[in-house]
Amino acid sequence: MGGFFGVAGKTDCILDLFYGVDYHSHLGTRRGGMATFGKGGFHRAIHSIENSPFRTKFERDVEEMKGNIGIGCISDFEPQPLLIQSHLGSFAITTVGKINNLDALLNIVYENGHTHFQEMSGGQINATELVASLICKKETIVEGIRYVQEIIDGSMTMLIMTNEGIYAARDRYGRTPLMVGKKEDAYCVSFESFAYMSMGYSDYKELGPAEIVYITPESVEVVSEAKKDMKICSFLWVYYGYPTSSYEGVNVEEMRYKCGSMLAKRDKGTIEPDVVAGVPDSGIAHAIGYANESGYRYARPFIKYTPTWSRSFMPTNQAQREKVARMKLIPVPSLIEDKRLLLIDDSIVRGTQLRETTEFLYNSGAKEVHVRPACPPLLYGCKY
């Protein structure tokens, strides 16, 4: 996944930008970046966050970067934001999305005279750079964004920062969210709605599918109207979204309670657990919803050790990721031994980690372990 945040204010915005981007750390584990525009022009910083959290890596940059307009991101893939110089002028761009027809789009830009792209490790092309190249094929940034929305097979939500403001564009089917917040002397734009709440912003606008707005320190202007066809990612409520966020007016935590409640209604009279538990972190709210509806006791038979195992430290190697996941879970023997446990997870994708967690509980003395996924069975892979 990935997430981003932008600010256009009448005064220096770097602290709001820094904390706003940091509030998206649950959406990515590989790279973070910030770009600002001020009296000294454009400034940018990009760092790896694989072994250290965003805040730690960017503390020095906060002291050095200045500007009243800024954008930043947390990314699981390419380094960004990128600084672009073109016939449209200078701008910075950051994206959240997935391009399924990348090779076909590369052929389009090559055939139109684009000679090269910067290659990333593994021979991959930076998708954000490709998006910028496609935008620059048109006469204005807005026309370029519309062109990208039409031509990409996949999803693409983006922020583009000029020397005067920020263009914010939501994916054409609204698969990923985009919110605008407002306070007295600034506007912000964010993937996560909760990211600006602690900084004095209030909700101003949630963009619709394919909608484009232009944000300056003084105003928010709709430059391309929203479309009606909405296909938002349901996994935002199940897994990706932070509990305090809301999408399309529906809070993540409340939705997870409802999922757990519906599971309990379906199970009524078929199981009598001693303990209802959730797999940390996203399974916990589902389990609370189940326990509240069923009347069975909610407890934490195992607890995730977080002081030295933050989510931002997650190796890219799958075997190492699974080992780290195991090491995080610490059992509470008195809540496991000779107990019938009902374990609720947000979903089952590969099933590897859930199987190991179940074995872990049995090895810790559980009498029975029953598993309930809060998400319906995943029958087809999502290409977005």
Where do the language-model regions lie?
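Conserved short alpha-helical segments that host acidic/polar catalytic motifs at enzyme active sites
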Residues: 1-208, 214-274, 279, 368
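Flexible loop/turn segments at secondary-structure boundaries
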Residues: 12, 101, 175-176, 196-197, ...
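A short acidic (Asp/Glu
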Residues: 44-46, 170-171, 286-289, 381-383
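An acidic- and aromatic-residue-enriched active-site/binding cleft used to recognize and process polar
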Residues: 163, 171-172, 281, 303-304, ...
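Secondary-structure transition/capping motifs at alpha-helix termini
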Residues: 268-273, 292-299, 333-337, 359-368
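Extended, hydrophobic alpha-helical segments in both membrane/secreted and soluble proteins
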Residues: 276, 283-290, 294, 298, ...
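Short, glycine/charge-rich flexible loops or terminal/linker lids adjacent to PRPP-binding catalytic cores
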Residues: 295-341, 379-384
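A short, conserved beta-to-alpha structural element at the edge of catalytic cores
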Residues: 359-384
